From Swiss-Prot:
Keywords: Coiled coil, mRNA transport, Nucleus, Ribosome biogenesis, Transport. One of its GO terms (molecular function) is mRNA binding. Component of the 66S pre-ribosomal particle. GO terms for biological process: intracellular mRNA localization; mRNA transport; ribosomal large subunit biogenesis. The gene is loc1. Belongs to the LOC1 family. InterPro entries: Loc1 (IPR037650). Residues 39-49, 129-151 have a biased composition (Basic and acidic residues). The lineage of its organism: Eukaryota, Fungi, Dikarya, Ascomycota, Pezizomycotina. Required for efficient assembly and nuclear export of the 60S ribosomal subunit. Residues 181-190 have a biased composition (Basic residues). The keyword Manganese does not apply. This is 60S ribosomal subunit assembly/export protein loc1. One of its GO terms (cellular component) is preribosome, large subunit precursor.
Length: 190
């Protein structure tokens, strides 16, 4: 078996063991002594200056609510009051005339919008009506041209077939009917 190392650290009973351990420990001590360390940086002084700078720049900031400043770019009517510390809402003063003037202004504005919408709708309806009439007129013109063309073709036929064409057309119709009878094929399904 392999020799067991003593479990107790520190001074050993055998002379050889103590000799071996001393040079190792002395060598490690020497290497630590010879290793040069950089000089320590002054971190503490910087930390003190940073904290002092932070303390200097840190000031209390007040909110708008604490200062009680009015909000900018807001138009508040005369009768509207916003009580502090309560729910947001509009509380009208008991001034009936002021309230009625505000209501009248709003209603007039809304009626103006409605009237303008109605006017636009009427104008659009008139435009649609005019377009529809134009389309009907074009359609009627096309029909008239078609009817005139049909009449002219009929008159040309009548002029050509004053006497000879009538007898030939009767004969041709009878021949075509007999041919159609002959050409018919019967199909039986099995």
């Amino acid at each position: 078996m392999a020799p067991n190392k003593p479990s107790v650290k520190g001074k050993s009973s055998s002379k050889g063991d103590s000799g071996k351990s001393k040079p190792l420990s002395s060598a490690s001590k020497v290497s630590k002594k010879h290793a040069k360390r950089p000089p320590p940086k002054e971190v503490k002084s910087k930390a003190r200056t940073e904290s002092s700078l932070l303390k200097k720049t840190k000031k209390r900031e007040y909110t708008e609510e604490e200062l009680g400043l009015p909000k900018l770019n807001m138009i508040t009517p005369v009768g509207v009051v916003k009580p502090k510390g309560k729910k947001k809402g509009k509380v009208f003063v008991d001034d009936q005339e002021g309230m009625m003037t505000i209501l009248a202004m709003v209603n007039a504005e809304q009626e103006g919008h409605i009237e303008s919408k109605l006017q636009k709708a009427r104008q659009l309806e008139e435009i649609r009506e005019a377009k529809r009439k134009e389309a009907e007129a074009r359609h009627a013109e096309k029909k008239n041209k078609l009817e005139e063309a049909k009449q002219s073709i009929r008159q040309k036929r009548k002029r050509k077939s004053s006497g000879n064409e009538d007898s030939k057309s009767d004969a041709s119709t009878s021949k075509s009917s007999s041919k159609s009878k002959e050409k018919r094929k019967s199909v039986s399904f099995a």
